[in-house]
């Protein structure tokens, strides 16, 4: 009887051990899957940032040109320098991958320092978007009314700020891709 009890005890210990090993393996597998998911989320955010950089680079020259044209018209007090119309396009940076990564189960597995740097860059991008929206509103408010220096001065001022922010956002995104810390807080 004692040997039977001892055998049952050994079997019970083995079963408990097997269950514990199974739990540990399952936990390890789940942890690995979450880390892999975090790596994919980070790669998606970095691809999104690279696409945003391309948009900012593609639209910088046109924005600078319009800003220079408006500046010349304002400095010379001559709205006729503007010609018939002012046309340019602004980037439409995406934050979809960034937002999705923040709401996913991968979020706790992303490097915290990287998350802070990316968050700061997207905050600057959001500020840029607000300034761009106001500049577009300002410009659209004078369409068909005949441009005057008085109406163009605030638009020019906003475009100066917008152009500066354009470069800041691009530079922050580029620094993220290069793995560099931001140059300013």
What name fits each language-model region?
Residues 82-185:
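Soluble extracytoplasmic domains of inner/organellar membrane proteins
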Residues 1-16, 28-30:
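N-terminal positive-inside, membrane-proximal cytosolic segments immediately preceding the first
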Residues 59-66, 70, 125, 139-142:
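N-terminal soluble domains immediately following signal/targeting peptides that reside
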Residues 19-41:
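Transmembrane signal-anchor/signal-peptide helices with a preference for the extracytoplasmic
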Residues 42-67:
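N-terminal alpha-helical signal peptides/signal-anchor transmembrane segments
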Residues 58-61, 68-82, 87:
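Conserved non-transmembrane functional hotspots
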């Amino acid at each position: 009887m004692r040997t039977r009890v001892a055998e049952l005890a050994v079997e019970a210990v083995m079963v408990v051990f097997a269950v514990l090993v199974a739990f540990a393996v399952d936990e390890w597998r789940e942890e690995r899957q979450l880390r892999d998911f975090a790596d994919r989320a980070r790669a998606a955010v970095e691809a999104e940032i690279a696409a945003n950089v391309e948009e900012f680079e593609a639209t910088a020259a046109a924005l600078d040109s319009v800003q220079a044209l408006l500046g010349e018209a304002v400095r010379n007090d001559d709205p006729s320098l503007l010609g018939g119309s002012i046309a340019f396009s602004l980037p439409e940076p995406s934050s979809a991958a960034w937002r999705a990564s923040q709401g996913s189960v991968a979020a706790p597995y992303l490097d915290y320092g990287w998350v802070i740097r990316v968050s700061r860059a997207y905050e600057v991008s959001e500020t840029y978007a607000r300034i761009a929206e106001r500049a577009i509103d300002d410009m659209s408010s004078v369409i068909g009314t005949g441009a005057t220096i008085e109406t163009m001065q605030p638009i020019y001022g906003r475009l100066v700020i917008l152009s500066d922010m354009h470069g800041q956002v691009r530079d922050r995104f580029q620094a993220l891709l290069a793995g560099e810390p931001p140059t300013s807080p």
